Amino acid sequence: MTFSRRSFMKTAAATGALTALGRPVLAQGIRWDMADEYGEQALSGKASKYFLEQLNAKIGDALTITYQGGGALGYNSVDHFDAVQDGAVQAAVTLVTQLGGIDPFFNLSSLPFIASTPEEAMMLWQAAREEYAKIFEENGMVLLWAMPNPPSGINAPEPITSPEALEGLRIRTYDVNGTNTMMNAGAAPLQVAWSDLIPQLSTGGIDAVLTSADGAMQLSLWDYVSDFTELNYAMGLFMCHVNKDEFDALPEDVQTAIMEILPACDEYNWSIMVDSIQTAYDTMEENGMTITLDDDVPAEVFEFLQEAGTSVREDWVAQTGERGQAVLARFEELKSQAG
């Protein structure tokens, strides 16, 4: 009889004992890895640390999850879906807007200007969470929590204060939505993975970067560009997802403990995202970067980018059909209720 790694984990979980405290343990313990393309100082890393701390407080060493940040396991976000689905790694924190090729619904959170504030980004997550969870479940995974990126802006050699500033700009984008929007705006976008960004800047492959202020701070982009323009373009979501076979193999009270801490994780993640914005601005200015806030960006720039993103939003609705329409309707309802 041949035993796969998954069947072994199920058997091990089923034969585990309980400590006197009622915490489930196994003879060898249950150990997982959690992949993250980004590092422990990035917001995805901080969100992962909080999740692991909260889990440890509830279950002790019944489940040990090792955070593997900075692409330590050799996976980028675009690889995580297959890696977790196949059981090559038990868990991952993934920038899901890079998974649009698997299901276009994943592109929702990076639709240009759909959510313009952290509060709206939370409402969009609440409106769409059920559909996200369904996609993961249908592919052998369990969705846990989300971590929003701070609003994206443009790091460039000069502020983006006119549509002409985008013309021919060789700009890094992080997903298909950004690529198509920037192309429509007359720029020359190139989708570049996080790990390849600095080499591209160093060799002149790109001149500008579409990312958040926190991302700019993490990469010390002041070494390459002088300006950050606040555009509140999008707040793409990271999501933590785990292999369903591995999750189902856990003792029931461990599964329950994981699910119980998820609301606290979302609340914490949104709070650190909001706090990160001013922290990043302060650090960038201390290192010589000029920050152009959205109030100082001419209205014509936003109107121009809104127009450039119109077809991107329309295409997403066409690709996702009733699913997309239903989620957008729920999103508008939540916004209306919030006043």
For the regions a language model picked out, list residue spans one by one.
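N-terminal secretory/targeting leader peptides
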Residues: 2-22, 26-120, 128, 132, ...
